[in-house]
A protein has these predicted regions:
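Short acidic, glycine/proline-enriched helix-loop-strand junctions
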Residues: 83-95, 189-210
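N-terminal glycine-rich anion-binding loop in soluble enzyme alpha/beta folds
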Residues: 1-56, 117-154, 252-264
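Short, flexible loop segments at boundaries between secondary-structure elements
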Residues: 146, 201-225
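Glycine-rich, highly charged phosphate/nucleotide-binding loops
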Residues: 47-64, 158-165
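Active-site rim beta-loop-alpha module in soluble metabolic enzymes
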Residues: 129-183, 190-193
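Periplasmic-binding protein-like
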Residues: 7, 67-77, 175-183
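Short, acidic/turn-prone active-site loops that include or flank metal/cofactor-
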Residues: 97-102, 118-120, 209-212
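Glycine/small-residue-rich loop that forms an oxyanion/phosphate-binding "nest" at active or ligand-binding sites
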Residues: 59-104, 108
Length: 266
């Protein structure tokens, strides 16, 4: 049985139920998942300044998840904020939804496009796709121009706008599959599909929440069998291998206060 911590990296519980209800149908029967959110962070990361503040809290949340006995940690935002830092800090697998989705996109189609929430996110996602080495397979990054705080007010309207944009992007770019490049947009889309919208369910749309959690399940299994052999020689080298005292100071700074609350604590 895998225990997975899925972090909504927002200083609010507004999205927890939406994520939980749209993720659970995709889980293995033996998988246990806990949805958490941040307790000392901005309510959204639509802009880069709050995103930077949130990244420190995400690092603390990853440490908490490992200490709480989780087998994997998912950062529930397609910016993949603090992904590299968390992998440096903890020994359990850490999964970012965008990295998971673009890495698996070839299994869904020869080329992909990304549809995200608003235009502010477009260049950031382009940069991350280039960082992940998959720019040549990406036909486009586009947006539906919704802000995250508005989405929970009318998730079905978000889903409908996403469906229209996905069709348009497929038609104009030739992309065979589309990754929804926002975890909340994707949850809105999945909610509509789960409620019986067969047209939405019929499109080749990649859900980053599901991709991240399924990858977390797999990597938790790999770790349990001794096969999660992450390299610590350079990119993910841990601070303590260089200076134990410095690493301890950083850890103390990161754990001065609890970073997260779970759905059961709200």
């Amino acid at each position: 049985m895998a225990r997975i911590c899925f972090l909504n990296p927002f200083g609010t519980d507004s999205y927890d139920e939406l994520i939980d209800s749209t993720l659970r149908p995709a889980l293995h029967g033996s998988t246990e998942i806990e949805i958490r959110h941040l307790s000392h962070a901005p309510a959204n990361i639509d802009y880069y300044a709050p995103k930077h503040l949130v990244e420190t809290e995400i690092m603390t949340a990853a440490i908490e998840a490992e200490r709480d006995g989780f087998d994997a940690f998912v950062i529930g935002c397609c910016y993949d904020p603090a992904l590299t830092q968390c992998r440096e800090l903890v020994s359990i697998p850490v999964i970012g939804p965008l990295e998971a989705s673009v890495s698996l996109s070839r299994l869904f189609g020869h080329s992909f496009a990304v549809v995200t929430d608003h235009r502010k996110a477009v260049p950031e996602l382009r940069d991350r796709i280039r960082l992940y080495g998959l720019e040549s397979n990406c036909r486009a990054v586009d947006a539906i121009d919704w802000y995250v705080t508005d989405m929970v007010l009318d998730p079905i309207a978000v889903a409908k706008d996403t469906y229209i944009k996905v069709q348009d992007v497929m038609r104009t770019t030739g992309a065979e599959t589309v990754i929804i490049g926002c975890t909340i947009v994707s949850a809105c889309y999945e909610l509509a599909a789960l409620r019986g919208d067969t047209e939405m369910a019929s499109l080749s749309v990649v859900n980053p929440n599901v991709m991240a959690v399924k990858l977390a399940e797999m990597f938790a299994d790999l770790n349990a069998t001794g096969q999660y052999r992450i390299s610590r020689t350079a990119y993910y080298q841990q601070h303590a291998s260089h200076d134990v005292a410095e690493a301890a100071e950083i850890l103390e700074l990161l754990t001065e206060h609890p970073a997260t609350r779970s759905m059961t604590q709200v």
